[in-house]
């Protein structure tokens, strides 16, 4: 009985006598022994109470005192301790003995670059979605260094032009220029060498505006639908001859949506030069002659179908 009562506190190795010994009898002092996982590298786990003995012990303890319960059985695990130090190789102490985890050799360090040097990708062309695989980096200050004529001439001398480069130069020379680019291009003699960097190619975008057809030569005026104009202006982009007389150049016009007399959007003039519907300001009549006719200004017609 006494052995069962004191069994939970001395069944483990290193915590007292063996199972079933009388605790009142003086026992010889145990020598300080090294732990089992230090002395024996491959020691078997200690045999604990089996399920039958544990159930029997629990029943006896419940009769003596309901509050007395057997000590929880130690899990069948292996103790392990890890030394964590980022500067030293990690040392692991387990039941197999001391082990050392070697750190993998670090990769070769790349040379430190300046922090201001930002690298990014850039497209191959102005509106091209294809991105150049080479990384483009700006120097300090965000401006490209100016190349002297001597530095530009040296690589040209070293590398001979390939036949592909010659073909590209021929194709670029044969590309036709638009009228707007020819008008904006300065005369070769008047351009200064210092202004070459400041000159930039001007890009023009188109937008649709509601316009009309008016030929001054044959006095023909028709309503038209939307006209392609240069954005921010009333200049018609697609210029052509009059379809009736084939003399008037660029008959398509775009007017401001306002009265021609008072120059207001909401007109209150008693007498007007010609009928202007402010709700539809570009649908204009000439002296009312087109009313109730097949091609009247009240209907919308596109200039593409007017002959």
Swiss-Prot record:
InterPro entries: Zar1, ZAR1/RTP1-5-like_Znf-3CxxC. Transmembrane segments: none annotated. Residues 138-200 are annotated as: Disordered. A zinc finger (3CxxC-type) spans 208-293. Keywords: Cytoplasm, Developmental protein, Differentiation, Metal-binding, Oogenesis, RNA-binding, Zinc, Zinc-finger. GO terms for molecular function: mRNA 3'-UTR binding; zinc ion binding. It is found in: Cytoplasm, Cytoplasmic ribonucleoprotein granule. Expressed in oocytes. GO terms for biological process: negative regulation of translation; oocyte maturation; translation. The keyword RNA-binding applies. GO terms for cellular component: cytoplasm; cytoplasmic ribonucleoprotein granule. It comes from the Eukaryota. Residues 156-186 have a biased composition (Basic and acidic residues). Pfam families: Zn_ribbon_3CxxC. mRNA-binding protein required for maternal mRNA storage, translation and degradation during oocyte maturation. Probably promotes formation of some phase-separated membraneless compartment that stores maternal mRNAs in oocytes: acts by undergoing liquid-liquid phase separation upon binding to maternal mRNAs. Binds to the 3'-UTR of maternal mRNAs, inhibiting their translation. Disordered regions undergo liquid-liquid phase separation (LLPS) for the formation of membraneless compartments that store maternal mRNAs in oocytes. The 3CxxC-type mediates binding to the 3'-UTR of mRNAs. Belongs to the ZAR1 family. This is Zygote arrest protein 2.L. It comes from Xenopus laevis. The gene is zar2.L.
